[in-house]
């Protein structure tokens, strides 16, 4: 296993390779958090993910771990360092089966809105391995586009949940930062 450095919430503002996305989801924070806990949902709305395996038993909490199989054969071993259902969660890579990054973390925040909707904030920060540091700035537009597609996939997935658990207002445009 290629070990990765743990990151903290402060690293999202410190690292150059950091992205922020915001959108409105047509479901309550509770329902969206259920989607995040459901390992079967991830490959549907995040096409780059082939499989999610929780390696810690429920109830999930800080310290919970999971393995995520990603297209291209990458397996990421993740540890959650924030777990506050239904409001926020964050994890960092403990390691990967391939030398992909030195460190990577993701932060998910769910803010309740009127009409049973949710403001979703997703932040991703990473440090490239030394040989990729010079190429990383050139890849930023492609990474941003790739991540925006994941957000759009989540919007579609949530919008198609059973009507009793979603709001009926139209989806909002994704805003990407970073």
Which residue stretches match the model-derived regions?
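Hydrophobic ligand-binding cavity/cleft-lining segments
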Residues: 1-56, 175-178
């Amino acid at each position: 296993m290629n070990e990765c450095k743990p990151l903290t919430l402060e690293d999202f503002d410190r690292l150059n390779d950091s992205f922020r996305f915001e959108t409105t989801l047509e479901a309550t924070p509770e329902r969206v958090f259920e989607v995040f806990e459901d390992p079967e949902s991830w490959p549907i709305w995040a096409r780059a993910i082939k499989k999610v395996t929780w390696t810690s038993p429920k109830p999930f909490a800080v310290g919970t771990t999971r393995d995520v199989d990603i297209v291209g054969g990458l397996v990421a071993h993740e540890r959650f360092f924030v777990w506050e259902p239904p409001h926020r969660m964050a994890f960092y890579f403990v390691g990967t089966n391939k030398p992909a990054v030195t460190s990577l973390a993701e932060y998910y925040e769910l803010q309740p809105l009127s009409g049973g909707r949710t403001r979703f904030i997703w932040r991703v920060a990473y440090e490239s391995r030394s040989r990729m540091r010079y190429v990383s700035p050139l890849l930023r537009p492609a990474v941003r586009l790739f991540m925006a597609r994941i957000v759009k996939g989540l919007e579609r997935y949530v919008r198609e949940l059973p009507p009793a658990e979603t709001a009926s207002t139209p989806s909002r445009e994704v805003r990407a930062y970073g």
